[in-house]
């Protein structure tokens, strides 16, 4: 009997947990189902059901401004089930794949199974990943998809380093959340490093750096990486032209000009928004109540300081130095647009925008605990997971009933 690979088992457990918590309830904010229906009819504008669906009124028609990858993933299901397609179910599956990929990354980094289980549990429940997947709304499934494909890109970079596949996963990530495009220079850097120096663990299932790297020049992966990204860029410009009549994407800027929280001119990314974003990410607390349930997470969120303190494990990562530096740079690059944006992710539990850079921090956490897992790390992960589960319970009990 063939033994199930641990990464697949981790993915199945994550799917089961997320499905159990979400009850696979369809989200009313199924913008990607509407977009998939539109694409199947050969158009970019959606049949707008009403104001509860965020869509940009442009030229008398309504358009989804979010990155479209989840809609493309839904195409075969929408072709069969139409408007009844359950967008939340896709979010649940993507969360499972993200956790499975994380487990595989942990193996390639040389983690013990017990340490890997703790880190993967943190990725699912200790961040906003579980909450986003359980609800499955248009904004939330985008985060889940971005985490999923970012983890897959990191797995490939820690393995065979096929440039075209890294580019494909990276494109899927930034076509889920646009901010993920900021990680591309880091991926390119890791592709150009000599393979035997870039893979942290050379003992993992025969994937030794030496055997895979012999005879391969450092430029070959980068060429295929660039070719795939170039093709994606052409398709992206065509999609923009179909929506806006221009090759560039003006969706978010136009939305910002129409939004009550925005401004009639200028960019949605400004240094003037930095103080509020930093307060949101690191200070904002839930409101204390006199009675049950004692705490109320406001719609504006709760800082990762209180929801995901186990992220501090990332600062312990020391080697391999190229990976440590690359992952920190990726996290910082991806964080920049999020800390300059005009809104902090409202409505949410925790700080959902942190999911854009948390995959890189989770990878750093893995490197940090390869040799020794500090006892306080277990405590912080357990706390983070309990807070994440509590957040799911609160929202499904009091908000999304």
Language-model segment annotations:
Residues 1-197, 206, 212-401:
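Membrane-proximal envelope and lipid/glycan-remodeling enzymes
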Residues 200-201:
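Long, distal/terminal scaffolding or interaction modules
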């Amino acid at each position: 009997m063939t033994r199930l690979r641990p990464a697949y088992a981790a993915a199945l457990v994550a799917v089961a947990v997320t499905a159990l918590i979400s009850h696979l309830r369809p989200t009313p904010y199924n913008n990607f189902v509407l977009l998939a229906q539109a694409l199947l009819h050969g158009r970019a504008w959606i049949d707008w059901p009403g104001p509860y669906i965020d869509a940009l009124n442009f030229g008398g028609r309504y358009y989804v401004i979010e990155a479209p990858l989840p809609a493309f993933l839904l195409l075969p299901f929408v072709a069969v089930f139409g408007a009844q397609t359950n967008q939340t179910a896709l979010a649940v599956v993507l969360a499972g794949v993200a956790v499975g990929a994380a487990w595989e990354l942990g193996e390639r980094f040389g983690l013990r199974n017990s340490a890997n289980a703790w880190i993967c549990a943190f990725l699912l429940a200790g961040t906003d990943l579980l909450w986003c997947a359980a609800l499955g709304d248009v904004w939330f499934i985008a985060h889940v998809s971005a985490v999923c494909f970012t983890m897959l890109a990191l797995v490939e970079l820690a393995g065979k380093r096929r440039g075209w596949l890294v580019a494909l996963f990276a494109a899927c990530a930034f076509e889920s959340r646009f901010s993920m495009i900021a990680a591309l220079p880091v991926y390119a850097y890791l592709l150009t490093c000599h393979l035997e120096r870039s893979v942290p663990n050379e003992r993992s299932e025969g994937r030794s750096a030496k055997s895979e790297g012999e005879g391969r020049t450092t430029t070959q992966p980068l060429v295929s990486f660039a070719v795939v990204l170039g093709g994606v860029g052409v398709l992206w410009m065509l999609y923009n032209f179909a929506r806006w009549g221009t090759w560039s994407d003006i969706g978010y800027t136009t939305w910002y000009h129409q939004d009550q929280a925005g401004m009639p001119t200028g960019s949605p990314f400004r240094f003037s928004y930095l103080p509020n974003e930093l307060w949101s990410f690191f200070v904002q607390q839930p409101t204390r109540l006199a009675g049950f349930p004692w705490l109320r997470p406001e719609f504006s969120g709760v800082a990762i300081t209180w929801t995901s303190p186990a992220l501090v494990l990332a600062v312990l990562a020391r080697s391999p130095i190229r990976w440590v530096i690359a992952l920190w740079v990726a996290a910082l690059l991806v964080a920049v647009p999020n800390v300059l944006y005009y809104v902090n992710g409202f409505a949410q539990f925790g700080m959902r925008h942190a999911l854009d850079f948390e995959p890189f921090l989770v990878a750093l956490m893995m490197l940090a605990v390869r040799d020794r897992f500090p006892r306080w790390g277990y405590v912080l992960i357990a706390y983070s997971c309990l807070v994440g589960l509590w957040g799911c319970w609160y929202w499904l009990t009091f908000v999304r009933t």
